[in-house]
């Protein structure tokens, strides 16, 4: 019996060993960052026809001039024009009723029930109180699913911009972006190798100080970035949230595949502002044990942070350039190129989509749009090699509010959230990139971009006679050309050109979508504001005059009371003096009485006179007291 049992255990161990070896063999660097080169079962695009039709999208970019012997160049010299193809957007479904039920089952959020309108049905409660946007995703080829995290907010007022709390929820979608509700994944813990059972949708267990009646609690702006753990993929969810004292907003990551390990990041020897956001995460291929962040673009500051304790060092910094705009605000997590290509030693290149925030341009007070960026590391140096102008992927961007037309609101918001996947799909080198994004703080959608790698590989920069060599993509890959002063000047010029082009884009966007109407609306709002300011000014003047009148009246009353008090004090002193004098006379008379005999009749007369004087004084005091009392009652 024991022999048979041992044989059975040996067989089971052998099978598990084979499975484990298979897992280790199938996990490779080509899958890192949601990027697969296999094109087979690991591909996110088994059926290219399911992606829909691709439409042309012209893209203008600006490339740094790396050659010192070239002349001072203008934006036209640095520009590169190419063509991409893009699909229509695909809006991602989200069963908010299902997610709401999950959230309310958690003790810390159960109090939300009391803030909902109790007269409504569940469907009506969801429509009024619950909102979702900012979905960020990565493709997991090991599981054939897209892993997406999104922000879900609850508003007692029924306004998305006035949340009571903000919650991050993880979902999975199949290759065709169908939501998988109630599904589960058996996941290998990326650091221990133990199997972890995860059911989706999944409310990420992020600590929050939910206080009934308070607002803006919880995690915001989720972004997911994929790293390679020792035993498999480890999607890290980055977010910002208030600290436990509710006084500071900091950057955190949580690892859903590693027992929800959560880390808060802190920069050593650096005074961090009260509110932190817009950090851009990326990983070095040869160092997956630390996460890097682009902390800001001006100054260009790069951090290296521990995934264990969150301590960060500033590993690269170019001082702030006052003449350079700071309109680049955050970006998607950065990923490497989709295939291994020859590159200079100790050099690495990432692609990302930062966003611009441009004020008072086109048909909106604020316009947010993505750009394309090529970010480069040479040794310990980092810099931006390429920036495009604004991209809208051919969309009529949803209005933030208003009547539904593109220029009917004060804000035009198209935010890139993450690069879900980027892979070469055929032997001809054709590539597809999937980007998740949000519009107007309302939606989560994806589009598919075809030919981005080819766009970059065909890149040509300045080729004038003064240039030693043409600045093409091959040169970017093979040369080490970082020079502190030159690189700073190059980045200033490229960013200036790209932002000028972005401003030109939003002006054109407004002209073709109702700029005249916007100007009329702005003029009306300006007049309304001026009228309100004038009324406010008049009201303030009237209030000041009334305040002055009250102060003067108060002073008069105080002066009258002061004089009356002085008069009363004088009369009191006078009475005290009379009383004292009377006491002296009485004492004198008593002494005289003791010193000599007085006729009884004379004594009686003097006593009567004394009593009469005392009576008159008392009567006078009584009348004066009655008079004062009457005057007080009259007041």
UniProtKB/Swiss-Prot annotation:
> Which Pfam family, just one, is annotated for this protein?
BMT
Q: What job does the chain carry out?
A: Beta-mannosyltransferase involved in cell wall biosynthesis. Initiates the beta-mannosylation of core N-linked glycans.
Any one Gene Ontology cellular component term annotated for this protein: microtubule cytoskeleton
- Would I find Endoplasmic reticulum among this entry's keywords? no
Extracellular side of the membrane: what ranges?
28-635
GO terms for biological process?
cell wall organization; microtubule cytoskeleton organization
Annotated membrane topology:
Single-pass type II membrane protein
Q: Which regions form coiled coils?
A: 512-635
Region annotation Disordered: where it falls in the sequence: 517-635
Keywords, sorted A to Z? Cell wall biogenesis/degradation, Coiled coil, Glycoprotein, Glycosyltransferase, Membrane, Signal-anchor, Transferase, Transmembrane, Transmembrane helix
Question: What is this protein's gene name?
Answer: BMT2
Q: Which domain of life is it from?
A: Eukaryota
Keyword check for Transmembrane helix, yes or no.
Answer: yes
Provide the glycosylation site positions. Answer: 484
| Regions crossing the membrane | 7-27
EC number(s) given by UniProt = 2.4.1.-
- Localized where? Membrane
Q: Which InterPro entries match?
A: BMT1, MAP7_domain-containing
Q: What is this protein called?
A: Beta-mannosyltransferase 2
Family listed: Belongs to the BMT family.
Q: Which residues lie on this side of the membrane: Cytoplasmic?
A: 1-6
User: A single Gene Ontology molecular function, please?
Assistant: mannosyltransferase activity
PANTHER family, A to Z: MICROTUBULE-ASSOCIATED PROTEIN (PTHR15073), RETICULOCYTE-BINDING PROTEIN HOMOLOG 2A (PTHR15073:SF1)
């Amino acid at each position: 019996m024991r022999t048979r049992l041992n044989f059975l255990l040996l067989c089971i161990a052998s099978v598990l060993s084979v499975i484990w070896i298979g897992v280790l063999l199938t996990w490779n660097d080509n899958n890192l960052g949601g990027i697969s080169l296999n094109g087979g079962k690991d591909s996110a695009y088994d059926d290219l026809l399911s992606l829909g039709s691709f439409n042309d999208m012209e893209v203008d970019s600006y490339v740094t001039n790396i050659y010192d012997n070239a002349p001072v160049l203008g934006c036209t010299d640095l520009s590169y024009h190419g063509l991409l193809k893009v699909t229509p957007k695909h809006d991602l479904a989200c069963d908010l009723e299902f997610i709401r039920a999950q959230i309310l089952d958690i003790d810390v959020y159960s109090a939300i029930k009391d803030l909902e309108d109790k007269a409504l049905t569940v469907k009506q409660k969801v429509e009024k109180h619950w909102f979702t946007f900012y979905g960020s995703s990565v493709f997991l080829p090991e599981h054939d699913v897209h892993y997406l995290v999104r922000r879900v907010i609850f508003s007692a007022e029924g306004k998305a911009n006035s949340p009571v709390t903000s919650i991050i929820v993880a979902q999975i979608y199949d290759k065709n972006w169908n939501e998988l509700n109630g599904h589960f994944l058996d996941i290998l813990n990326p650091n221990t190798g133990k199997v972890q059972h995860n059911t989706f949708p999944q409310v990420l267990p992020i600590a929050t100080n939910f206080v009934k009646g308070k607002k803006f609690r919880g995690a915001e702006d989720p972004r997911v970035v994929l790293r390679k753990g020792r035993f498999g993929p480890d999607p890290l969810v980055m977010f910002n949230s208030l600290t436990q004292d509710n006084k500071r907003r900091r950057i955190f990551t949580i690892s859903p595949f590693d027992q929800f390990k959560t880390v808060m990041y802190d920069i050593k020897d650096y005074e961090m502002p009260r509110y932190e956001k817009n950090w851009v995460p990326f990983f070095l291929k040869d160092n997956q044990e630390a996460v890097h962040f682009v902390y800001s673009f001006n100054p260009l500051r790069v951090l290296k942070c521990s995934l264990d304790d969150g301590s960060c060092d500033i590993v690269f910094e170019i001082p702030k350039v006052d003449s350079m705009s700071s309109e680049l605000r955050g970006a998607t997590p950065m990923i490497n190129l989709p295939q291994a290509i020859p590159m200079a030693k100790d050099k690495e290149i990432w692609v990302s989509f930062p966003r611009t925030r441009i004020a008072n341009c086109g048909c909106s007070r604020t316009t947010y749009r993505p750009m394309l960026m090529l970010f480069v590391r040479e040794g310990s140096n980092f810099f931006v090699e390429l920036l495009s102008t604004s991209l809208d992927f051919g969309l009529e961007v949803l209005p933030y509010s208003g009547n539904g037309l593109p220029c009917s609101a004060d804000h035009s918001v198209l935010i890139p959230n993450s690069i879900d996947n980027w892979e070469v799909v055929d032997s001809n080198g054709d590539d597809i990139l999937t980007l998740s994004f949000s519009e107007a703080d309302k939606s989560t959608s994806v589009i598919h971009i075809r030919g981005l790698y080819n766009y970059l590989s065909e890149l040509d920069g300045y080729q004038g006679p003064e240039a030693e060599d043409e600045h093409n993509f091959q040169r970017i890959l093979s040369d080490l050309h970082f020079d502190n002063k030159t690189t700073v000047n190059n980045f200033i010029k490229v960013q200036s050109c790209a932002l000028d082009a972005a401003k030109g884009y939003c002006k054109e966007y407004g002209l073709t979508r109702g700029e005249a109407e916007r100007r009329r609306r702005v003029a009306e709002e300006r007049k309304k504001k001026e009228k309100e300011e004038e009324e406010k000014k008049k009201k303030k003047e009237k209030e000041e005059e009334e305040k002055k009148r009250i102060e003067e009246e108060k002073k008069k009353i105080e002066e009258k009371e002061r004089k009356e008090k002085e008069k009363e004090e004088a009369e009191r002193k006078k009475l005290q003096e009379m009383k004292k004098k009377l006491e002296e006379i009485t004492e004198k008379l008593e002494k005289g009485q003791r010193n000599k005999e007085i006729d009884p009749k004379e004594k009686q007369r003097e006593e009567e006179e004394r009593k009469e004087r005392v009576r008159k004084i008392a009567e006078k005091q009584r009348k004066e007291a009655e008079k004062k009392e009457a005057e007080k009652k009259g007041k």
